[in-house]
């Protein structure tokens, strides 16, 4: 596949807050650009463009790139260059397994701690998802989707749980941003989220777990459609 140079891949409003840790911000900004496909698979990463845009030295950018390479989101090729990694099919499956296992265990614990206020927070996120879907704001929809799952994970009482899940699903997230949603995809996701919330509101463990696993499995099945449509963005089997 021909490589494209990722010139000016960062959002215009991507800025560094000098009062916070610069390396961590550089990492988050670059990771977000890769996850949302603003820096697409196979693109050449030009350090100077990034440092000029963010107004920082090359050191934090290089540190961020090394972290992203550890996550297999970036390929560093000595004497050749640095590239955004293709979406790894094996990592997709691995991410699915990790996410499914941890979210199922997390929601079981969350069910022991959930109160009416938490149920209302989840319902509020459903409303925000519905608004984003009605206005075709796909990136906002995904953000609220993640907030929904993060809220449940945090209810488990384990503060690191969502961070582990979020890191493991990086390749899955890239697929989510690949194109406009498939027909009725967002409506289905909202309905599935609603089923999860209502089961949790009733403190029904079996229905809660079934609703969550159905939602996660259905979401993963859609990746096969996008894999065929965008084969050039994926590694070969």
PLM features: residue spans?
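Alpha-helix N-cap/N′ positions at the starts of helices
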Residues: 79, 102, 124, 188-191
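Conserved amphipathic alpha-helical segments that form helical-bundle/coiled-coil interaction surfaces
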Residues: 95, 107, 112-178, 191-199, ...
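Short helix-capping and inter-helix turn/linker motifs at the boundaries of alpha-helical repeat units
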Residues: 21, 119-120, 184-187
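Short, surface-exposed helix/turn micro-motifs that flank interaction/cofactor sites
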Residues: 35, 62, 69, 153, ...
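Short linear motifs at protein or domain termini
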Residues: 1-112, 117, 220, 224-237
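Mobile beta-alpha loop/short-helix "lid" or hinge segments that flank ligand
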Residues: 69-75, 168-170, 185-187
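C-terminal regulatory/effector modules of DNA-binding transcriptional regulators
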Residues: 2, 182-237
């Amino acid at each position: 596949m021909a490589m494209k140079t990722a010139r000016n891949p960062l959002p215009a409003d991507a800025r560094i807050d000098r009062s916070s840790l610069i390396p961590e911000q550089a990492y988050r900004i670059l990771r977000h650009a890769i996850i949302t496909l603003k820096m697409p698979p196979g693109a050449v990463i030009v350090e100077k463009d990034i440092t000029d845009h963010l107004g920082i030295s090359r050191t934090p950018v290089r540190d961020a790139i090394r972290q992203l390479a550890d996550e297999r989101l970036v390929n560093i090729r000595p004497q050749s260059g640095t590239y955004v990694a293709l979406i790894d099919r094996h990592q997709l499956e691995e991410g699915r397994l990790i996410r499914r296992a941890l979210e199922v265990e997390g929601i079981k614990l969350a069910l022991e701690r959930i109160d009416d206020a938490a149920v209302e927070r989840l319902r509020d996120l459903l409303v925000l998802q519905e608004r984003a879907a009605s206005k075709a704001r796909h990136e906002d929809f995904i953000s609220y989707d993640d907030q929904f799952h993060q809220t449940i994970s945090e209810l488990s009482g384990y503060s690191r749980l969502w961070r582990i899940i979020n890191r493991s699903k990086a390749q899955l997230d890239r697929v989510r941003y690949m194109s406009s949603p498939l027909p009725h995809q967002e409506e289905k996701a909202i309905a599935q989220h609603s089923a999860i919330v209502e089961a949790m509101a009733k403190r029904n463990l079996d229905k809660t777990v079934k609703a969550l696993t159905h939602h996660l499995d259905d979401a993963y099945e859609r990746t096969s459609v996008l894999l065929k449509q965008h084969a050039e963005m994926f590694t070969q089997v």
